[in-house]
């Protein structure tokens, strides 16, 4: 069999459960650099589509790289269909986006993809900023999220600051955060998981709030003092994995939070500045 024939036999195409669209670093454990191994640990196949390719996070004293050009980004997405690699696709997740134009390109691709995958789960982590840093993405990204990705998503995972930006509402207490999250729900957007919600500082707790049209569940976890980056990306990877493995939403959120805490403690024990996934035997 010739190599040309071999690589054009689409029945042999590698398939994935998840397409993960977000940042990638050469050194470190953020974006797809932590999400992909975490998803694979859960026994799921994943294709990683980079939005930015960086040497490392900008917290180090040297930093190189930038956003993937639109032509490349759209080509990465198109190639997955050209390779016929999406027959078994179950979910698409998004994290850090490099430009507003990438968000528009992704939304157009998702809209077309849904025609062949009407049950596709689209989970958006609207990475915009946080309370400590403010907005740390380009200023036109929040509106691009509102206009293009939120109307397509079944679930989103904003932190408190991002929830405020997306809704224009003050969310510094639990009731206001819940109200803001409910204001985003629609026929398409079924749930909002608010990370880093107000917790009990005295008891060293943080809260994650799971909001649907019918219920609100508040999950408390121990607060770990750390500057580790990528914990949100890991949380989303664990969450989507749990959902695809059949866990109910609140249970999947709870388990994802516990796994993040486990990874953070393991990383601290190994005195690393970058997240380290424990082997499955220790998970």
From Swiss-Prot:
Residues annotated to bind ATP: 125, 157, 162, 195, 221-224, 231
Pfam entry (one)? Phos_pyr_kin
Give yes or no: UniProt keyword Kinase. yes
One GO biological process this protein is involved in is:
pyridoxal 5'-phosphate salvage
The reaction(s) this protein catalyses? pyridoxal + ATP = pyridoxal 5'-phosphate + ADP + H(+); pyridoxine + ATP = pyridoxine 5'-phosphate + ADP + H(+); pyridoxamine + ATP = pyridoxamine 5'-phosphate + ADP + H(+)
Any note on cofactor binding?
Can use both zinc and magnesium that is complexed with ATP. However, magnesium seems to be the preferred metal used under physiological conditions.
Binding residues for Mg(2+), per the UniProt record?
A: 136, 162
InterPro entries tied to this protein:
PdxK, PM/HMP-P_kinase-1, PyrdxlKinase, Ribokinase-like
Show the GO MF annotations. ATP binding; hydroxymethylpyrimidine kinase activity; magnesium ion binding; protein homodimerization activity; pyridoxal kinase activity; pyridoxal phosphate binding; zinc ion binding
Q: How is its activity regulated?
A: Is activated by the monovalent cation potassium.
This protein's cofactor list reads: Zn(2+); Mg(2+)
UniProt key word Nucleotide-binding: yes
State the UniProt keywords alphabetically.
ATP-binding, Kinase, Magnesium, Metal-binding, Nucleotide-binding, Transferase, Zinc
| Top-level taxon of origin | Bacteria
Q: Where does substrate bind?
A: 23, 59, 233
Q: In which pathway does it act?
A: Cofactor metabolism; pyridoxal 5'-phosphate salvage; pyridoxal 5'-phosphate from pyridoxal: step 1/1; Cofactor metabolism; pyridoxal 5'-phosphate salvage; pyridoxine 5'-phosphate from pyridoxine: step 1/1; Cofactor metabolism; pyridoxal 5'-phosphate salvage; pyridoxamine 5'-phosphate from pyridoxamine: step 1/1
Q: Which family does it belong to?
A: Belongs to the pyridoxine kinase family. PdxK subfamily.
Share what the entry says about its subunit structure, partners included: Homodimer.
Function according to Swiss-Prot or TrEMBL: B6-vitamer kinase involved in the salvage pathway of pyridoxal 5'-phosphate (PLP). Catalyzes the phosphorylation of pyridoxine (PN), pyridoxal (PL), and pyridoxamine (PM), forming their respective 5'-phosphorylated esters, i.e. PNP, PLP and PMP.
Q: What is the protein name for this chain? A: Pyridoxine/pyridoxal/pyridoxamine kinase
Q: Which organism is it from?
A: Escherichia coli (strain K12)
What gene does the UniProt entry assign to this protein?
pdxK
């Amino acid at each position: 069999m010739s190599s040309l024939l071999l690589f054009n036999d689409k029945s042999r195409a590698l398939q994935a459960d998840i397409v993960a669209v977000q940042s990638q670093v050469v050194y470190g454990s953020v974006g797809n650099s932590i999400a992909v191994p975490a998803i694979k640990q859960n026994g799921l196949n994943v294709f990683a589509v980079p939005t930015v390719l960086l040497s490392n996070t900008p917290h180090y004293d040297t930093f190189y790289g930038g956003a993937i050009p639109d032509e490349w980004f759209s080509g990465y997405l198109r190639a997955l269909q050209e390779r016929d690699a999406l027959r078994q696709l179950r979910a698409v997740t998004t994290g850090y986006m490099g430009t507003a134009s990438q968000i528009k390109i992704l939304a157009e691709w998702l809209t077309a993809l849904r025609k062949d995958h009407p049950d596709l789960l689209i989970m958006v982590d609207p990475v915009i900023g946080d309370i400590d840093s403010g907005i740390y993405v380009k200023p036109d990204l929040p509106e691009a999220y509102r206009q293009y990705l939120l109307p397509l998503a079944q679930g989103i995972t904003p932190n408190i600051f991002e929830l405020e930006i997306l809704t224009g509402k003050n969310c510094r207490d639990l009731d206001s955060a819940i109200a803001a999250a409910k204001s985003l729900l629609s026929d398409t957007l079924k749930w909002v998981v608010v990370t880093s919600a107000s917790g009990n500082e005295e008891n060293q707790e943080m809260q994650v709030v799971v909001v649907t049209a019918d219920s609100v569940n508040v999950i408390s976890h121990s607060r770990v003092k750390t500057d580790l980056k990528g914990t949100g990306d890991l949380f989303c990877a664990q969450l989507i994995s749990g959902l695809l493995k059949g866990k109910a939403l609140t249970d999947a959120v709870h388990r994802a939070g516990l796994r993040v805490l486990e990874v953070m403690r393991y990383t601290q024990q190994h005195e690393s500045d970058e997240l380290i996934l424990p082997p499955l035997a220790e998970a």
